Structure formats: structure tokens, C-alpha cells
From Swiss-Prot:
GO BP field: response to xenobiotic stimulus
Function: Drug-resistance related protein, its expression is associated with the chemotherapy resistant and neoplastic phenotype. May also be linked to the malignant phenotype.
Record protein name field: Chondrosarcoma-associated gene 2/3 protein
Summary of the tissues where the protein is detected: Weakly expressed in kidney. Expressed in various tumor cell lines including carcinomas, myeloid and lymphoid malignancies, melanomas and prostate cancer. Overexpressed in taxol-resistant breast cancer line MDA 435TR and the doxorubicin-resistant multiple myelanoma lines RPMI-8226/Dox40 and RPMI-8226/MDR10V.
Superkingdom classification of source: Eukaryota
Location of region: Disordered: 68-127
Length: 127
């Protein structure tokens, strides 16, 4: 029964060899779910018998029945497969480092000027 499910996956994979992996999962998802639900009692029995020997989460993920995130290896070419971040169109200056011309845009706030240094009670100044 489990072998039949694997053969079903392999057969579809061979037939649609030109498709990417995501497209393969998308095309076979409905059929695979039906097969999986029909065979669920046998899966539970096999799971109890082979619990220590079989990584069920990996088998179900690879069969396309469960969507789980794959952890790509650092050396994998798929790890660099993200689209480039779009460039922002601006004046070219970073907002946290606006430059001297930005000082004239903002008026000085009252009360922010430094006054004479106040003595803190309980501390001695330098002799």
C-alpha cells in the first residue's frame, strides 16, 4: 500500500519531468490527499510498527502530502534563490544620516540648548 503510494508519486514525477518541484506538488496535491486519506489506517499501523526506523514526517513531506519547510544546506544552490530586494528611489541619502542640509529644515526646539553644568548634590567636584 505504501509502495503503491510511492509508485504513484514516482509515476507522476516521471511523466511531468519538465515541471518544477512546486508545480509537481500543485498538480498532484488533490490526488495525493485522496490516496493518503484512503490509506490512513494502514499508515498508523505502519507508524507504530516502524516508529524507530522511519522518519514519517520526511516521507510525507517528500510525497507532497504535508507542506513543511525544508532547511536548505548552506552549500545548496537553492539557498540563494530569493529574488533581489527592490531598490528604493530617493534622494540617495540615508534617512538616519541626512547630512548638513537637513539641519536648516528643522527649527531648533526651545529648552534643548545646553546651559551651565549643574552640581549634583552628594558628589565632590575636582579640587
Amino acid at each position: 500500500m505504501w509502495m503503491g503510494l510511492i509508485q504513484l508519486v514516482e509515476g507522476v514525477k516521471r511523466k511531468d519531468q519538465g515541471f518544477l518541484e512546486k508545480e509537481f506538488y500543485h498538480k498532484t496535491n488533490i490526488k495525493m490527499r485522496c490516496e493518503f486519506l484512503a490509506c490512513w489506517p494502514a499508515f498508523t499501523v505502519l507508524g507504530e510498527a516502524w516508529r524507530d526506523q522511519v522518519d514519517w514526517s520526511r516521507l510525507l513531506r517528500d510525497a507532497g502530502l504535508v507542506k513543511m519547510s525544508r532547511k536548505p544546506r548552506a552549500s545548496s544552490p537553492l539557498s540563494n534563490n530569493h529574488p533581489p530586494t527592490p531598490k528604493r528611489r530617493g534622494s540617495g541619502r540615508h534617512p538616519l544620516n541626512p547630512g548638513p542640509e537637513a539641519l536648516s529644515k528643522f527649527p531648533r526646539q526651545p529648552g534643548r540648548e545646553k546651559g551651565p553644568i549643574k552640581e549634583v548634590p552628594g558628589t565632590k567636584g575636582s579640587p
